[in-house]
Amino acid sequence: MTELLWAVVALLAGLAGGAGIGVYWANNGVSSLVQRKAAEARLLIEEARSQQKEILLQAKDEALRIRNEAEAELRESRQSLQKQEERLQRKEENIDRKLEGIERRERLIQQRERQIEQLTQEAERLKRQQAQELERISQLSREEARSIILAEVERETREDAARRIRELEQQTKEEADKIARKIIGLAIQRCASDYVAEMTVSTVNLPSEELKGRIIGREGRNIRAFEQITGVDIIVDDTPEAVTLSCHDPVRREVARVALLKLLKDGRIHPSRIEEVVHKTQLEIEQIMREEGERVAYEANVQGLHPDLIKLLGRLKYRTSYGQNVLQHSLECALLAAHMAAELGANVNIAKTAALLHDIGKAVDHEVQGPHALIGAEIARRLGRSAAIVHAIAAHHYDEEPQTVEAFLVIAADAISGARPGARRETLDLYIKRLEALETVATSFPGVQRAFAVQAGREVRVMVQPDQIDDLASIHLARNVAKKIEESLQYPGQIKVTIIRETRAVDYAR
């Protein structure tokens, strides 16, 4: 019994000890877990704070950048506004100066008119006095003395009138030039064309050199069929991966170019397929021309054009003059002529319609003989345009003498559009040869010392020998030089001929 009791006590003691040890280790494990979690929490908090600082820094940098950009834009806007204000102020000052100049000239004219009136009265008084004196001295009859006096007065009056006419002509010319520059400037500003010159491309690039053989075909049947159907010559030479299309008709050349590209893309190249593709392409190009003609007529606000005129107008899309697209040139002329007609109080509809159609003859000038201005005028007449429009078209290159304001406006619009920088271009060799030819023509006249082609060939300045060419001969020389340039040279726009005659008188004070 005692042994059993001790055994039970020992068992209980062991259990108690094991339980204590278990509790001890459990407490230690929980404590270490808590410490690890706390460390992890602190680490997360530090990372969050670090990220918060980075985000705040980035936000501050972005805010600073946005603020700097806004300040820069604000400065630019202020500078732009300041420049605009300065330009407006300068324009206002120029206008004020011009108005003051006009008022001064008006006062001067009135003063000169009063002086002329006084001089006329004085001349009458002197005439009477001279008549009395002559009659007294020479014992001439009154009629004889009257004839002598009238002859003298007539001579003096003619001189005064000629001098006055020259002054008025010069003043009128200055005023007219000033008004013309203003009207042209307003028209150009309102037109604001952004078109640049272009060249017609007649070269078709090939994906590979092997396609040249397929274009030629067996024994040349493909190329012969293509040339026969389109009327365009295909030049296959040593140019790598390219063939050239040659034809005087730009529409046929465009049809051939588009059809050849379609055949190359399709891959089937044989005579029957060529005929089918060319026929479809012709219909497409005709549709494109009609659409282009309608578009340009709509943009120019010209209504009621005959469908054939619309089609011919669209054909100008494929014509160029010195690199300038003729269709776009016609639209630009129409807008310029309309604005100038509105400023002058002329018929806007006649001016813009004639300007839009002024080069319509170029659409068929390779088919019809004659100047394109007269060809276009005849087409416009047959298709129902008014006589005023027909005359303006025919006169825009002086094939007819211009008789109406609208005709002169078409001439001016054509010259402005062609002379605009960047509108037309020539090769360097042709440009240099044209300048040399201008100088050669001018120096071929006797009495000419030197000649200079300036303003990109738009003006020729001729220096003459003052002892051989007087003022009257200078006028004839300018006319003769201009006439010879017209007869012997080809050039876009117009060329101004300026004769410069300089005389010097030198003496020495000793």
Curated annotation (Swiss-Prot):
GO MF entries: RNA binding; RNA endonuclease activity
EC numbers: 3.1.-.-
Domain KH per the UniProt entry, residue ranges: 200-260
InterPro entries: HD/PDEase_dom, HD_domain, HDIG_dom, KH_dom, KH_dom_type_1, KH_dom_type_1_sf, Ribonuclease_Y, RNase_Y_N
A GO CC annotation given for this chain: plasma membrane
Region forming the signal peptide: none
Keyword field contains DNA repair: no
UniProt domain HD: residue ranges: 326-419
Pfam families xrefs: HD, KH_1, RNase_Y_N
Source organism, top-level taxon: Bacteria
Topological category with respect to the lipid bilayer: Single-pass membrane protein
Main location class: membrane
CDD domains per the UniProt record, alphabetical: HDc (cd00077), KH-I_RNaseY (cd22431)
This protein's UniProt keywords: Cell membrane, Endonuclease, Hydrolase, Membrane, Nuclease, RNA-binding, Transmembrane, Transmembrane helix
Stretches that traverse the bilayer: 4-24
Function: Endoribonuclease that initiates mRNA decay.
Record PANTHER family: RIBONUCLEASE Y
Stated name of the protein: Ribonuclease Y
